[in-house]
């Protein structure tokens, strides 16, 4: 149920107007981007979410709602309400573990997602890379960073192998191990893009696990594993730049030291992978 309003409302007003019988249960963090809180009534639970990035355009939050509205409940939470600065979605019962599931199981989830109808908007990385450069701390901008940005701008993004709907933030903390199978939460970066971009972006533990995930996916998708792995590797510089830039952007936004540490680590990885 989308509800349009130009005037933001506070949490208590949201609950009293739309969920008068529900009460807050707990607040929990959801990855590095921010948090949500849980409401409950007679055993029924919803997650109340706000935009993770307060500076992001409202259209980005609306796109997340639209993505969830068209995805099957077998892989994503169903949304129940959208209005400015708020979204209410189903709570997915299950375990959120600190490690990825079996690569074959994860490949099955991603392949099923990629068979769904496209969302209708493309993921383009270059505008994000340039935004993060512009919005980062000037003292953190280096000649090397600018050089890599110019190099990618000149090279252009890899041509998609297959264009599909993507989640684009697959890591252990965004995977719910439910009784009916794996499901994904936190769809804020979702959009249409190359399947190899999704596979390249998965937060794996090591190269061996990454190769196995790609091989398992290739089997399902009937693609030569070596061909898919080459395409995944083409995206690596783009994704490392995206991660480093996002950490820099969030550092300036929040002042949280964890983002500086993560940015520095990603810059080191980028130099290694060049």
From Swiss-Prot:
Cysteine disulfide partners in this protein: none
Function statement: Catalyzes the ATP-dependent phosphorylation of thiamine to thiamine phosphate. Is involved in thiamine salvage.
Pfam annotation, one family: APH
Protein name: Thiamine kinase
Catalysed reaction equations from the record: thiamine + ATP = thiamine phosphate + ADP + H(+)
Annotated keywords: ATP-binding, Kinase, Nucleotide-binding, Transferase
InterPro entries assigned to the protein according to its UniProt record, in alphabetical order: Aminoglycoside_PTrfase (IPR002575), Kinase-like_dom_sf (IPR011009), Thiamine_kinase (IPR014093)
Organism: Escherichia coli O139:H28 (strain E24377A / ETEC)
ATP-binding keyword on record: yes
Lineage, opening ranks: Bacteria, Pseudomonadati, Pseudomonadota, Gammaproteobacteria, Enterobacterales
Gene3D superfamilies tied to this protein: 3.90.1200.10
